[in-house]
Amino acid sequence: MKLKKPKFWDHKKPSFFSYLLLPFSIILGLITKIKSKPKFSNSKIKTICVGNIYIGGTGKTSLAIKIKEILDKNNIRACFIKKFYPNQTDEQKLLSKNGVLFSNLKRITALNEAISEGFEVAIFDDGLQDSTIKYDLEIVCFNNLNWIGNGLTLPSGPLRENINNLKSYENVFLNGNEESLIAIKEQIKRINPNININSGKYIPLNIDEFDKDQNYLVFSGIGNHKTFVEMLKNNKLKIVSDLEYPDHYQYSKKDFDEIIINAKKFNAHIITTEKDYLRLENLNKNEIFYVKSSLDISDEKNLTNKLIKLNEKN
């Protein structure tokens, strides 16, 4: 059984539990530095890492897919690379639906496979903290709803590394409405005045398939359930109930039956994400509808130019 992230991680100020775990955060940070290895660099393929500092729910996979779409439009042969995790088959399937995916327990092995297949660009979904690979382009993703939570590193908070490490990064991508991002952008610029900030929000691609007079029950096991529900409400769907499960949750028949029973109580149709739908492969999905979404990037031209220039570099 997979647990949800602790609620105190997303409090705006550290709680008693955060301070209680602070010594472990310090120890974990020291271990990470000690285990750091020389980074692998190569000239045979360009590497882009779409990663995060806040753990989970920042839109990495969606941005990786968007980058692949942009490269495809410009006739640049790109693939995806994702470290293999048995509990993240949903993301692996989603990436595979949108291009060639190389997945291995070691990212460097997957990268060498991509090189042998003649790809020009490798897009890493996650791996920002992988100390073995030197990326040509790194993009740090955040979600406006959670931002950095209580601002502390694991396990005291939700951060994989200190937020001040943004000083060493060149690119940030923010998920959310522009109005909600103003304060976050100001905080980022105070840390690194020269950092490039782009932003975007999720848009549903098949929203016209849904009757807006109908009741809907929403369920998901993704990093940021609230973002998904907010998107549906912004598109005028009548959400009467929503069920949140842990990220990458593997649904049992019992879970599935409970979802069906809850929907019947509200006389509601059932909606989930494409990721969750892919995890229901062994269950009867006839009563489940999924929303296919994409990222609408505020300055796609800027991102496109950056990607083209990257590929042109020797």
Swiss-Prot record:
GO biological process, one term: lipid A biosynthetic process
Gene Ontology molecular functions: ATP binding; tetraacyldisaccharide 4'-kinase activity
GN (gene name): lpxK
Binding annotation for ATP: 54-61
Protein's job: Transfers the gamma-phosphate of ATP to the 4'-position of a tetraacyldisaccharide 1-phosphate intermediate (termed DS-1-P) to form tetraacyldisaccharide 1,4'-bis-phosphate (lipid IVA).
Keyword Nuclease found: no
Catalytic activity, reaction form: a lipid A disaccharide + ATP = a lipid IVA + ADP + H(+)
Pathway this chain belongs to: Glycolipid biosynthesis; lipid IV(A) biosynthesis; lipid IV(A) from (3R)-3-hydroxytetradecanoyl-[acyl-carrier-protein] and UDP-N-acetyl-alpha-D-glucosamine: step 6/6
One GO CC term on file: plasma membrane
Pfam families attached to this UniProt entry: LpxK
Species in which this protein is naturally found: Pelagibacter ubique (strain HTCC1062)
EC number: 2.7.1.130
Annotated protein name in UniProt: Tetraacyldisaccharide 4'-kinase
Entry keyword set: ATP-binding, Kinase, Lipid A biosynthesis, Lipid biosynthesis, Lipid metabolism, Nucleotide-binding, Transferase
Membership in a protein family: Belongs to the LpxK family.
Coiled coil: none
Listed PANTHER family: TETRAACYLDISACCHARIDE 4'-KINASE (PTHR42724), TETRAACYLDISACCHARIDE 4'-KINASE, MITOCHONDRIAL-RELATED (PTHR42724:SF1)
